[in-house]
């Protein structure tokens, strides 16, 4: 189902542990047509959590205020973290990445309406295809000194 070893490892070793310890919640998107026939078929999944984002020093005061919504001098901010998001390799044509991201954002909006919060964070490896995907979905790349990992809001 999951060709990517990192995805498989997360689902097999971490998802349930994070769920039990209330560190993150993992949501599976199921094929409703097959579920109605008694077949449990996962189309994709996403994991949500919270994380404190330490803002890069390079950000201007205006950029900081835009992110925080109130203050120019903020150095960190609480965020909703989309920690994992993936499609089942055997059902790629049944759901798009955009659809999975919309499901994740729906749950984040529900949480935000209850407890507040305004920033959604995605951490990912420096991969132009992934960065383009999130940019297309209105995420903004933060400047980052680390070459291997990028942060998008």
Language model: regions and residue ranges:
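Non-catalytic substrate-recognition and accessory regions of acyl/acetyltransferase enzymes
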Residues: 1-93, 106-121, 125, 129-153
């Amino acid at each position: 189902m999951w060709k990517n070893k990192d995805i498989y490892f997360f689902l097999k070793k971490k998802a349930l542990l994070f769920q039990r310890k209330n560190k993150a919640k993992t949501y599976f998107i199921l094929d409703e047509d097959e579920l109605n026939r008694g077949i449990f078929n996962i189309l994709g999944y996403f994991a949500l959590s919270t994380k404190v984002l330490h803002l890069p020093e390079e950000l201007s005061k205006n950029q900081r205020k835009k992110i925080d919504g109130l203050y120019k001098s903020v150095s960190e901010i609480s965020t909703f973290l989309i920690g994992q998001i993936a499609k089942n390799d055997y059902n790629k044509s049944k759901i798009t990445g955009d659809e999975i991201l919309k499901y994740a954002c729906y749950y984040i909006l529900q949480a935000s309406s209850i407890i507040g919060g305004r920033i959604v964070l995605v951490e990912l490896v420096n991969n132009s295809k992934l960065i383009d995907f999130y940019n297309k979905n209105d995420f903004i790349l933060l400047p980052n000194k680390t070459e291997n990992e990028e942060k998008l809001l």
